[in-house]
Amino acid sequence: MAEQKTGQKADQKIRIRLKAFDHRLIDRSASEIVETAKRTGAQVRGPIPLPTKIERYTILVSPHADKDARDQYETRTHKRVLDIIDPNDKTVDALMKLELAAGVDVQIKLT
């Protein structure tokens, strides 16, 4: 670990970003991560909800005329951020073994 000028060790932090289309799935996965990290003695901040990205698509229903006949679709991408402060080896091992749902995208950054 890097040392600061005061002689203390710098705080190590794991930042986990979750993305999913289903908000129930992402909340369940976030609670599993929080529970696992707390069980191993690490301190957790979050889950912090980030703004939901909404993409809307408008499609003409008619193959020829009728500009008024349209369908509208949207996809919502929900995001959460978790910070795990001062993780130990048990925390990292438990997070690596954790099985999350297939619809959740996980990005892990160590700082």
Swiss-Prot record:
Pfam families: Ribosomal_S10 (PF00338). InterPro entries: Ribosomal_uS10, Ribosomal_uS10_CS, Ribosomal_uS10_dom, Ribosomal_uS10_dom_sf. The keyword Transmembrane helix does not apply. One of its GO terms (molecular function) is tRNA binding. Keywords: Ribonucleoprotein, Ribosomal protein. The keyword Ribonucleoprotein applies. GO terms for biological process: translation. One of its GO terms (cellular component) is ribosome. Part of the 30S ribosomal subunit. Belongs to the universal ribosomal protein uS10 family. Involved in the binding of tRNA to the ribosomes. This is Small ribosomal subunit protein uS10.
